[in-house]
Amino acid sequence: MAGARSRDPWGASGICYLFGSLLVELLFSRAVAFNLDVMGALRKEGEPGSLFGFSVALHRQLQPRPQSWLLVGAPQALALPGQQANRTGGLFACPLSLEETDCYRVDIDQGADMQKESKENQWLGVSVRSQGPGGKIVTCAHRYEARQRVDQILETRDMIGRCFVLSQDLAIRDELDGGEWKFCEGRPQGHEQFGFCQQGTAAAFSPDSHYLLFGAPGTYNWKGTARVELCAQGSADLAHLDDGPYEAGGEKEQDPRLIPVPANSYFGLLFVTNIDSSDPDQLVYKTLDPADRLPGPAGDLALNSYLGFSIDSGKGLVRAEELSFVAGAPRANHKGAVVILRKDSASRLVPEVMLSGERLTSGFGYSLAVADLNSDGWPDLIVGAPYFFERQEELGGAVYVYLNQGGHWAGISPLRLCGSPDSMFGISLAVLGDLNQDGFPDIAVGAPFDGDGKVFIYHGSSLGVVAKPSQVLEGEAVGIKSFGYSLSGSLDMDGNQYPDLLVGSLADTAVLFRARPILHVSHEVSIAPRSIDLEQPNCAGGHSVCVDLRVCFSYIAVPSSYSPTVALDYVLDADTDRRLRGQVPRVTFLSRNLEEPKHQASGTVWLKHQHDRVCGDAMFQLQENVKDKLRAIVVTLSYSLQTPRLRRQAPGQGLPPVAPILNAHQPSTQRAEIHFLKQGCGEDKICQSNLQLVRARFCTRVSDTEFQPLPMDVDGTTALFALSGQPVIGLELMVTNLPSDPAQPQADGDDAHEAQLLVMLPDSLHYSGVRALDPAEKPLCLSNENASHVECELGNPMKRGAQVTFYLILSTSGISIETTELEVELLLATISEQELHPVSARARVFIELPLSIAGMAIPQQLFFSGVVRGERAMQSERDVGSKVKYEVTVSNQGQSLRTLGSAFLNIMWPHEIANGKWLLYPMQVELEGGQGPGQKGLCSPRPNILHLDVDSRDRRRRELEPPEQQEPGERQEPSMSWWPVSSAEKKKNITLDCARGTANCVVFSCPLYSFDRAAVLHVWGRLWNSTFLEEYSAVKSLEVIVRANITVKSSIKNLMLRDASTVIPVMVYLDPMAVVAEGVPWWVILLAVLAGLLVLALLVLLLWKMGFFKRAKHPEATVPQYHAVKIPREDRQQFKEEKTGTILRNNWGSPRREGPDAHPILAADGHPELGPDGHPGPGTA
């Protein structure tokens, strides 16, 4: 088959042009004036229930006398006498008049032969078409029955259908018109053949009026067919009687396999019946399961396609100047199809192109039309699919427009026009002809169930069809429901050379809409003077400036012979753009009506005929003290056609002519600009300013005229604003108007007229006022009601080289704890020539918690000495080492923390050195303050993990003493090392800090629920003496660092703490008394002892030589009595040490025993015995 279908013919149809009710309402006021006359519509009514309007056609009779007829089919009209039926249908002809009920029934189909036929419900008038002016008419009854063997057992009734062809005067002349046409009569009957032919469901004439086209969708089991027969117009056509007929299945072959339609919708159905009849209306349909289907070849897949449901023709569809026929099959392949056919032989129509539908059950091909929409010489194809729907986009009904590509149809992506849901958009189509006289045919689309029904008018163009409807006719406007079910156009019924439109309905009513002639108006606005010089008053009296305006009109129309007198009403509106901005106009019209506003003037001009030029004058005066001297004064001319009053026509009078209308595609307005003579704008008289916002930064207000810039973030572009109760904040702004290039100052930097700075504030800031360092530079700033939008006048004009600096005072009352950023949008504005862009001033808002932390250690110096003890040997805290106490104080100078979050005081306690040995042993942690009612200051984790005994009595006593008054016993006792380390071998100092990795810390965290003033954390600990003796005995000094900080847990992201940490150092030394013993090398001591012994020996020898040891003789005396006392072993050692002169102390942590057996030796007189040095001597054994 020629013209194969493309793989994706719907590739470009995704865009659906839907014009629903809302759009119709928006456009109706404009569309009603273009160009079908709704107000003067002619209404025709038929018998109730007759379906008068089911089909319609426009017809013009030329012989024997000119007459225009509205042909209306009424397929349910009552039967005529003699037809022996109740309802047979009929064709009605309505004259062009104002009467609504003056239609008469065309006299056809008289009588009935009940032995051969039945006319009951034959639906005469189901279709009606006219050849045009002076042409024939065809109307059909597709349910007409042919009968055989009436009242016999083998009686048959075949719904073959039939058509009537009438002459132009609505009479039947059998010798020329053929009278009754029944091509299915006499053919094989039954629904598989021609028993349900239903000829005349669609009928049409070829554009050359040579052929008559019939659609018979019921043939071949509703596969359908199309038939083309010669339609003789006169004796000249008698020579071509052998031309046809042509049929899709073959006139002679009558072969259903030749029917060119795709697969059908009902393959696989089983007929189940217990009635002895072949009438398919009495069959019950059942779908067979796959297992129940009989094996064998597949059945005919083209049944029930309804080929011939719509039919038309055109020349040039496939080949230039060659006539082709188009038939619709709306149920083919469940989607519908349209087939383009050509004559192949004396009896066959051969398919050339097949176009398939897009969606299932869309009814593609239900209606169709052929028209050259783009006037390229190749007719295009319009196809209706009224059952199309799109659920997501809420579309219902579609019309596809295929633009002929030089006879090639493969790969064409049609334009899809859509209607509203359930509207049946596309059930009827009509070619209107050139409705607007632009050289391109127009079409009409019916949507009878869109509200009360609508008809959409689409204009053709060089690109095809304009997707936006130019006019929408509504059934509601004429009081008809199901309006638009049938359409007919392309004929001029009233003689004004514009085609008209006849619309039918299912409400027994038809309406004719006549097209209005279109006027093309030319207009011109003249202005004097062209420029306004404010220094040259020219009004009467010489005090003001005036401007004269003149407007002139003329028109042309199609046809050139149409030349009525028309009246145009015009309005001149000054300062239109300024008023749209809400500003006061600068002019006043002097020649205006009193009821008109001062910025408007109106008038009327009468144009007697085409090309007649008529003018009107007006004058306006410029107001005094005009500020806007740069923007031009815009004068807008608008005009409209004065509509004549409708006069009531008396019965019997002819139709009044329709009033003309202005071309809707031609603008009916014109703008003219009147400029001011510009000063300070350079030689070109174009003010090219260079306004620049060189500074926009947030500041803290120190005084009324003193501001301090806020600190900037690390990016250098965002200020940091601390929310600490300050009521206002300043925004420093500096604006300049300097040339962008000093080397070319004439390029820009001209005066900036009406220079403004527009400030848009966030909800958290509100305008409060403006300040300037120089009062002369203070701009005028005005804000709106809620102080969120500020306009500052910078000058009118802001001169070349000017610079202004000022501060906006902004209230911070709207800033809350949720506010994280302040962004103020700034935009410079001027009516001078300059492209300006908005800029933003930003500040990051943070909430600074007024918490401070400080710490101290008591004492700040610790000493170590003694002996090394293991961890298991520790029983009490006194066994560990020197005690130390830390106090960390947190102060709150602001609001309660409860409103912001949860705060924690953390202390990093260095409990180990890097190798894991104890450093500072935590004994006790207590928090004083910082708690709410009923809350305890519990810190975690718990200290004293070795559970050493706490000497609470001794602790309380020592805490009350200042550090310098502590007992010597609290100092470290030197170790009993007799191998002291020299000072030269000692290192300088070591720092033990967790932050440096030289120590390991445990973090004690204490919650601060709520406090107003201060909270104090007390931490007691002990210096682990053994670690220092083992690791740092050769170190001169050690610095132990304890760190503390405050953390806050809060959902507020912009909290910030300053001074939220502290460092508490403690110096640790080897005990200074241990340094005396251990600071001298051993060999020095040995030499000193030997030297001392030598000196002693020499001294004794010298004294002996001198007789020092010889005593004088004394008289004998009574020798006193002594008591023997046992001296403890440890005291003996002390006595020995005192004799040698070496001073030693007890080991640290080993107190001196003072028992009852350690007492001095008493002499006989009860007093202590004195030693050689004059002091009491120790007891002796």
UniProtKB/Swiss-Prot annotation:
<keyword id="KW-0675">Receptor</keyword>
<feature type="disulfide bond">
    <location>
        <begin position="781"/>
        <end position="792"/>
    </location>
</feature>
<feature type="region of interest" description="3 X 4 AA repeats of D-X-H-P">
    <location>
        <begin position="1157"/>
        <end position="1176"/>
    </location>
</feature>
<keyword id="KW-0812">Transmembrane</keyword>
<keyword id="KW-0013">ADP-ribosylation</keyword>
<comment type="function">
    <text>Integrin alpha-7/beta-1 is the primary laminin receptor on skeletal myoblasts and adult myofibers. During myogenic differentiation, it may induce changes in the shape and mobility of myoblasts, and facilitate their localization at laminin-rich sites of secondary fiber formation. It is involved in the maintenance of the myofibers cytoarchitecture as well as for their anchorage, viability and functional integrity. Isoform Alpha-7X2B and isoform Alpha-7X1B promote myoblast migration on laminin 1 and laminin 2/4, but isoform Alpha-7X1B is less active on laminin 1 (In vitro).</text>
</comment>
<feature type="topological domain" description="Extracellular">
    <location>
        <begin position="34"/>
        <end position="1082"/>
    </location>
</feature>
<dbReference type="GO" id="GO:0098609">
    <property type="term" value="P:cell-cell adhesion"/>
</dbReference>
<dbReference type="GO" id="GO:0005178">
    <property type="term" value="F:integrin binding"/>
</dbReference>
<dbReference type="GO" id="GO:0008360">
    <property type="term" value="P:regulation of cell shape"/>
</dbReference>
<dbReference type="GO" id="GO:0035987">
    <property type="term" value="P:endodermal cell differentiation"/>
</dbReference>
<dbReference type="GO" id="GO:0008305">
    <property type="term" value="C:integrin complex"/>
</dbReference>
<dbReference type="InterPro" id="IPR000413">
    <property type="entry name" value="Integrin_alpha"/>
</dbReference>
<feature type="disulfide bond">
    <location>
        <begin position="140"/>
        <end position="163"/>
    </location>
</feature>
<dbReference type="InterPro" id="IPR013517">
    <property type="entry name" value="FG-GAP"/>
</dbReference>
<feature type="disulfide bond">
    <location>
        <begin position="539"/>
        <end position="546"/>
    </location>
</feature>
<feature type="disulfide bond">
    <location>
        <begin position="681"/>
        <end position="687"/>
    </location>
</feature>
<dbReference type="InterPro" id="IPR013519">
    <property type="entry name" value="Int_alpha_beta-p"/>
</dbReference>
<dbReference type="InterPro" id="IPR048285">
    <property type="entry name" value="Integrin_alpha_Ig-like_2"/>
</dbReference>
<comment type="subunit">
    <text>Heterodimer of an alpha and a beta subunit. The alpha subunit is composed of a heavy and a light chain linked by a disulfide bond. Alpha-7 associates with beta-1. Interacts with COMP. Interacts (via C-terminus intracellular tail region) with CIB1; the interaction is stabilized/increased in a calcium- and magnesium-dependent manner.</text>
</comment>
<dbReference type="GO" id="GO:0009897">
    <property type="term" value="C:external side of plasma membrane"/>
</dbReference>
<feature type="binding site">
    <location>
        <position position="498"/>
    </location>
    <ligand>
        <name>Ca(2+) 3</name>
    </ligand>
</feature>
<comment type="similarity">
    <text>Belongs to the integrin alpha chain family.</text>
</comment>
<feature type="repeat" description="FG-GAP 5">
    <location>
        <begin position="350"/>
        <end position="411"/>
    </location>
</feature>
<protein>
    <recommendedName>
        <fullName>Integrin alpha-7</fullName>
    </recommendedName>
</protein>
<feature type="repeat" description="FG-GAP 6">
    <location>
        <begin position="412"/>
        <end position="467"/>
    </location>
</feature>
<keyword id="KW-0732">Signal</keyword>
<feature type="glycosylation site" description="N-linked (GlcNAc...) asparagine">
    <location>
        <position position="989"/>
    </location>
</feature>
<feature type="binding site">
    <location>
        <position position="434"/>
    </location>
    <ligand>
        <name>Ca(2+) 2</name>
    </ligand>
</feature>
<feature type="site" description="Cleavage; by urokinase">
    <location>
        <begin position="647"/>
        <end position="648"/>
    </location>
</feature>
<feature type="transmembrane region" description="Helical">
    <location>
        <begin position="1083"/>
        <end position="1103"/>
    </location>
</feature>
<dbReference type="Pfam" id="PF20805">
    <property type="entry name" value="Integrin_A_Ig_2"/>
</dbReference>
<keyword id="KW-0165">Cleavage on pair of basic residues</keyword>
<feature type="signal peptide">
    <location>
        <begin position="1"/>
        <end position="33"/>
    </location>
</feature>
<feature type="disulfide bond">
    <location>
        <begin position="94"/>
        <end position="103"/>
    </location>
</feature>
<feature type="region of interest" description="Disordered">
    <location>
        <begin position="1138"/>
        <end position="1181"/>
    </location>
</feature>
<feature type="repeat" description="FG-GAP 2">
    <location>
        <begin position="110"/>
        <end position="175"/>
    </location>
</feature>
<dbReference type="GO" id="GO:0009986">
    <property type="term" value="C:cell surface"/>
</dbReference>
<dbReference type="GO" id="GO:0007229">
    <property type="term" value="P:integrin-mediated signaling pathway"/>
</dbReference>
<feature type="binding site">
    <location>
        <position position="376"/>
    </location>
    <ligand>
        <name>Ca(2+) 1</name>
    </ligand>
</feature>
<feature type="binding site">
    <location>
        <position position="374"/>
    </location>
    <ligand>
        <name>Ca(2+) 1</name>
    </ligand>
</feature>
<feature type="disulfide bond">
    <location>
        <begin position="1001"/>
        <end position="1006"/>
    </location>
</feature>
